[in-house]
Curated annotation (Swiss-Prot):
The keyword Ribosomal protein applies. It comes from Sulfurihydrogenibium sp. (strain YO3AOP1). Pfam families: Ribosomal_L34. This is Large ribosomal subunit protein bL34. One of its GO terms (molecular function) is structural constituent of ribosome. The gene is rpmH. Coiled coil: none annotated. GO terms for cellular component: ribonucleoprotein complex; ribosome. Belongs to the bacterial ribosomal protein bL34 family. The keyword Kinase does not apply. Residues 1-45 are annotated as: Disordered. Keywords: Ribonucleoprotein, Ribosomal protein. GO terms for biological process: translation. Residues 1-15, 22-45 have a biased composition (Basic residues). It comes from the Bacteria.
Length: 45
C-alpha cells in the first residue's frame, strides 16, 4: 500500500502554494494561523 500521493509539483503549488493561499480570504486565514503557531514553513516550497 502506498502512503504518499504522487502529485506533480505544478499541481501541488497551484493547489497549496503561497500565492494560491494569498488569493482567497480563507487561504490568508490559514497562513495567519500557521504564522501564529510558529510554523517554520507557512506554505509549501
Amino acid at each position: 500500500m502506498k502512503a504518499k500521493s504522487h502529485l506533480s509539483n505544478k499541481k501541488r503549488k497551484r493547489a497549496s502554494g503561497f500565492l494560491a493561499r494569498m488569493k482567497t480570504k480563507a487561504g490568508r486565514k490559514i497562513l495567519a494561523r500557521r504564522r501564529a503557531k510558529g510554523r517554520k514553513r507557512i506554505a509549501i516550497k
